[in-house]
């Protein structure tokens, strides 16, 4: 083979139908779906194969929470059949977590290769409309899909270099005695729950008096009361201005506020991984909310799409949403059609107890009392919760008066994360109480309570 023929063969090998940038849940689903449709696909990942969720996000967090939940269950039944509550052995729990996460990178990569999907590891950077550089390689495609996700935001304050992130927390070898979370979103609440159960003195600092602003204010207050009773301190209306290293730890300062701690986690939101891609070179725009896309998930460049957490869409940034968008876009790139239409999306805070919501929100419903009724229920003494000594179980369920259909549910309980999926089905499929009563559900289970919540 002469040199020119070799160059031509190499160039052709670098041409694909679709290049997917990002090897997380969205990108992997995208690549697998396109490959199944007969497309030639290259997937590029700059960090860990598998992405945030299984490596340093929802999955390892839930593994750590498993011990927290078991400990809490034993505590609730003290004097009611159990004697002595277990303590969390953090190094052993972390080893359990790593037993799962350590295999994600290689397992994901091998899974892609097993599907005969081409892979590249490195930072992708658009050079022009038809050239994407990955290290010293240059590839091109008919279409590109950006699925690079998000990363934790770091507040730009004096001493910001002392901030650690959720990534660091989920891989701690030892739990410090004092842990502080700056930011009262779901990440701060969830990791605070874990740290507190593991024996740390925990503070959650938030800049106003409304943490978890996307959730029902009343049930957020109930959750905070429960977490406070467990020993977590909430410092509201506090804007941290500086972090200083001292002989006794890390000192956080704000107006009329000082706190010394051992570990400071920035839990003040997440930002899109869009700034290293060279998007300006191809006419694609983004801001702190993500890459701008239309209702076909298409950017300003007609051959570049964005899905998952990196895209600016009107839905929560969640792994199942990313998967939904990937499935939609596989269809759009193979058989173009209708704009994306999202189903109802449940959101949750895996604290103790758990707070979940799906639908239009009770607050929105109260603005239209002629259209909706809001059922507010204290379920704490119901059998489902009494049997394991639950401290509280609350619900707000919104029903449309005209149709009798549930349009929103917000729940606070130890089994709320299971209940919310039932409500998601009820809302999405427009199930009325008579519809539900025509079913026979297993009893006694949380699902058998549904008919009493309409």
Regions found by a protein language model. Name each.
Residues 19, 42, 179-180, 305:
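Conserved beta-strand elements of the Class I
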Residues 21-29, 33-47, 59, 63-70, ...:
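Flexible, glycine-rich terminal cap/loop adjacent to redox cofactors
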Residues 19-21, 124, 139-149, 181-182, ...:
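Short hydrophobic core segments
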Residues 60, 132, 272, 299, ...:
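Hydrophobic "anchor" residues
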Residues 6, 13-16, 32-39, 44-175, ...:
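Glycine-rich flavin
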Residues 84, 125-133, 139, 200-295:
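A Rossmann-like FAD-binding core segment of flavoenzymes
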Residues 161-176, 258-332:
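FAD-site-proximal beta/loop scaffold in flavoenzymes
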Residues 58, 146-201, 205, 280-282, ...:
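Glycine-rich dinucleotide-binding loop and its adjacent helix/turn
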């Amino acid at each position: 083979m002469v040199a020119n023929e070799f160059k031509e063969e190499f160039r052709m090998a670098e041409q694909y139908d679709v290049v997917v940038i990002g090897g997380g849940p969205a990108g992997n689903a995208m690549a697998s779906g396109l490959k199944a449709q007969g497309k030639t696909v290259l997937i590029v990942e700059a960090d860990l194969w598998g992405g945030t969720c299984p490596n340093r996000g929802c999955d390892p967090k839930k593994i750590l929470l498993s011990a927290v939940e078991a400990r809490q269950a034993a505590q609730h039944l003290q004097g009611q059949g159990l004697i002595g509550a277990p303590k969390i052995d953090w190094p052993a729990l972390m080893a359990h977590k790593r037993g799962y996460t350590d295999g994600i990178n290689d397992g994901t990569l091998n899974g892609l290769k097993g599907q005969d999907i081409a892979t590249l590891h490195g930072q992708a950077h658009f050079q022009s409309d038809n050239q994407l550089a990955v290290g010293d390689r240059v590839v091109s495609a008919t279409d590109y899909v950006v699925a690079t996700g998000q990363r934790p935001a770091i507040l730009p304050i004096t001493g910001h270099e002392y901030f650690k992130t959720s990534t660091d927390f989920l891989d701690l070898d030892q739990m410090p005695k004092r842990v502080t979370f700056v930011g009262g979103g779901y990440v701060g609440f969830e990791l605070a729950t874990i740290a507190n159960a593991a024996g740390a003195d925990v503070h959650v600092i938030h800049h106003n008096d409304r943490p978890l602003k996307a959730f029902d204010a009343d049930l957020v207050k109930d959750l905070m009361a429960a977490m406070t009773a467990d020993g977590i301190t909430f410092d509201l209306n506090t804007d941290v201005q500086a972090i200083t290293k001292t002989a006794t730890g890390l000192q956080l300062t704000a107006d009329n506020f000082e706190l010394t701690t051992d570990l400071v986690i920035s839990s003040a939101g997440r930002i899109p991984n869009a700034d290293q891609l060279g998007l300006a070179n191809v006419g694609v725009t983004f801001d702190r909310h993500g890459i701008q896309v239309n209702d076909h998930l298409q950017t300003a460049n007609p051959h570049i799409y964005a899905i998952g957490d990196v895209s600016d869409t009107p839905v929560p940034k969640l792994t199942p949403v990313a998967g939904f968008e990937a499935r939609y876009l596989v269809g759009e790139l193979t058989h173009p059609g209708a704009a994306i239409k999202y189903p109802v999306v449940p959101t949750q805070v895996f604290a103790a107890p758990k707070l979940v919501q799906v639908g239009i929100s009770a607050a929105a419903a109260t603005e239209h009392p002629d259209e909706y009724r809001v059922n507010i229920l204290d379920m704490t003494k119901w059998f489902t919760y009494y049997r394991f000594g639950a401290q509280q179980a609350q619900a707000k369920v919104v029903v449309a008066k005209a149709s009798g259909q549930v349009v929103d549910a917000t729940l606070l309980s130890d089994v709320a994360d299971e209940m919310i999926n039932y409500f998601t089905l009820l809302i999405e499929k427009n199930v009325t109480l008579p519809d539900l009563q025509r079913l026979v559900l297993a009893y006694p289970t949380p699902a058998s309570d549904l008919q009493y919540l309409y």
